[in-house]
């Protein structure tokens, strides 16, 4: 085959690849929208270079499937643009931080890489394609985690070989984040990524990938303050990307900045709906549920239960999606209904919560856990046992060891409430401590951004029930250190302090609760109790 030319049939095959959305690529190819500024030199024709860089900018904001359309448009205009095939290949993982991905997408990625190599004009472009191949090669035999580490090493070498190629450094930082070990409490890869990204961000403040990946880098409680500046600017850098509107709330949610989280996700939902209305009328864009989950969680912390209920109703009414299915879509669509009953301690509702079919493992585990706790809390440990058995089966069949462990956290906590319902108090406490310790030993996953419920806070609830208020207060305070500004966390700490005879702390926590829920839209019992306590202290 001529290295500079591809048969027309091959080019047509790539241009015909499915993108899981409406096939009108006018928006992708016309230059509409604002996605930030990227400088990525290639050997492609001068005519398509701006189009290619715009496609990369969209890629940096995970605007799937639009970035696929954009790279296809570049190939159509310049079939010899090797890096457009690289773009098409890397785009097959809509969000590279959230596996798994369909095997047919991984296969298409490898095919695109080979076609890119066939037309590559420079050693640098071949090196880019070879590095990317590391994450796709043997996808049907080698686990994702192994391939991610392989890709991390390949991108490290690329960045070392081309120190002036800032995109190589940026994608190396993203490769580090793809390979993060969620049990590593030293945050070694995250800190390394931050050290790469932050200096470049000062040089290229309008680059969408820098703000985006800095947020992901510091999307962990001990690091979150470092991500505030990136969070505050990202939506302005890429205002046309729905994901860019949502991402700041990753930092805001960790820090308990609920109004800011709601603001970000309101914009993200609007952007998602505008996109769906234009590109796939009658569908819900697949990125919307993740944003809605953040929004529901934030509303519940503010005592705005009606707004949270509105969100759960909208999610329950979704009939058809556009865009790719993902772990984040499933958990985002499912979690708010469970949050709505768990945060309100609506145990009868929890016990009867529906379990939709055809979900990723942890997404199915969410309502199963909620039903188990609801059953135990309403005096039906037999039903709780059945749901716990289903959770155990889910843990065994999970997509990988991380999700198996996260489901096991739910197994332990649900088993604790079942033991409590059966009067086995020592067992209950041991199981709940196990759940809290296991959860604390790992980090949350980007596709389940806000943990379903802080298990150390739940340990506080159990200790309070068992008449151990001092220990309960310790548990609540430890939980609030990690899960900041939570309404029930403040309430539990206030009740525990009150029961332990520490009226000063009780007052402080009730004051925090009252301030947090000052704009509550329902008459929460916790808020009534806080107001009554504070009134009596005057």
Predicted regions and their residues:
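Amphipathic alpha-helical repeat scaffolds of TPR domains
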Residues: 46-54, 82-95, 120-140, 164-182, ...
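Residue at a conserved register position within TPR or TPR-like alpha-solenoid repeats
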Residues: 58, 92, 134, 176, ...
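Alpha-solenoid helical repeat scaffolds
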Residues: 52, 83-87, 170, 212-213, ...
């Amino acid at each position: 085959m001529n290295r500079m030319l591809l048969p027309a049939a091959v080019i047509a095959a790539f241009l015909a690849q499915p993108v899981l959305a409406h096939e009108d690529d006018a928006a992708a190819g016309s230059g509409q929208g604002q996605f930030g500024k990227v400088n990525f030199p290639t050997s492609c024709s001068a005519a398509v270079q701006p189009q290619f860089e715009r496609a990369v900018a969209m890629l940096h904001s995970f605007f799937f499937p639009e970035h696929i359309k954009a790279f296809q448009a570049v190939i159509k205009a310049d079939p010899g643009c090797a890096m457009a095939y690289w773009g098409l290949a890397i785009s097959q993982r809509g969000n590279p931080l959230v596996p798994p991905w369909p095997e047919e997408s991984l296969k298409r990625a490898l095919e695109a890489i080979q076609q890119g190599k066939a037309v590559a004009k420079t050693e640098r472009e071949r090196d880019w394609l070879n590095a990317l191949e590391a994450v796709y090669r043997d996808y049907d035999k080698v686990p994702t985690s192994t391939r991610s580490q392989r890709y991390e090493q390949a991108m490290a070498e690329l960045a070392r070989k081309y120190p002036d190629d800032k995109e190589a450094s940026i994608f190396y930082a993203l490769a580090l984040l793809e390979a993060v070990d969620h049990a590593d409490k030293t945050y070694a890869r995250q800190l390394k990524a931050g050290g790469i990204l932050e200096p470049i961000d000062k040089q290229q403040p309008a680059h969408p990938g820098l703000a985006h990946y800095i947020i992901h880098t510091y999307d962990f409680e001990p690091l979150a303050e470092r991500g505030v500046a990136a969070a505050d600017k990202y939506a302005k850098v890429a205002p046309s990307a729905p994901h860019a509107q949502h991402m700041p709330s990753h930092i805001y949610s960790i820090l308990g900045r609920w109004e800011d989280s709601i603001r970000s996700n309101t914009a993200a939902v609007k952007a998602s709906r505008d996109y769906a209305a234009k590109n796939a009328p009658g569908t819900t864009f697949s990125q919307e549920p993740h944003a809605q989950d953040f929004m529901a969680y934030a509303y519940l912390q503010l005592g705005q239960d009606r707004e949270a209920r509105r969100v759960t109703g909208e999610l329950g009414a979704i009939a058809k999606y556009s865009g790719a299915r993902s772990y984040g879509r499933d958990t985002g669509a499912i979690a708010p209904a469970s949050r709505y009953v768990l945060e309100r301690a609506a145990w009868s509702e929890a016990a009867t919560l529906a379990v939709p079919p055809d979900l990723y493992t942890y997404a199915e585990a969410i309502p199963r856990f909620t039903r188990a706790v609801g059953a135990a809390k309403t005096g039906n440990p037999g039903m709780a046992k059945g749901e716990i058995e289903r959770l155990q089966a889910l843990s065994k069949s999970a997509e990988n060891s991380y999700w198996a462990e996260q489901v096991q956290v739910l197994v332990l906590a649900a088993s604790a409430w079942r033991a409590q319902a059966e009067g086995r108090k020592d067992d209950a406490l041991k199981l709940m401590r196990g759940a809290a310790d296991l959860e604390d030993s790992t980090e949350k996953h980007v596709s389940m951004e806000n943990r379903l419920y802080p298990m150390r806070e739940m340990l506080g609830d159990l200790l309070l029930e068992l008449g151990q208020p001092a220990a309960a207060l310790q548990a609540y305070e430890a939980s609030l250190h990690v899960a900041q500004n939570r309404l029930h966390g403040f309430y539990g700490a206030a009740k525990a302090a009150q029961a332990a005879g520490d009226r000063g702390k009780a007052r402080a926590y009730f004051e925090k609760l009252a301030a947090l829920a000052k704009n509550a839209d329902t008459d929460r019992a916790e808020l009534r109790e806080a107001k009554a306590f504070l009134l009596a202290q005057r």
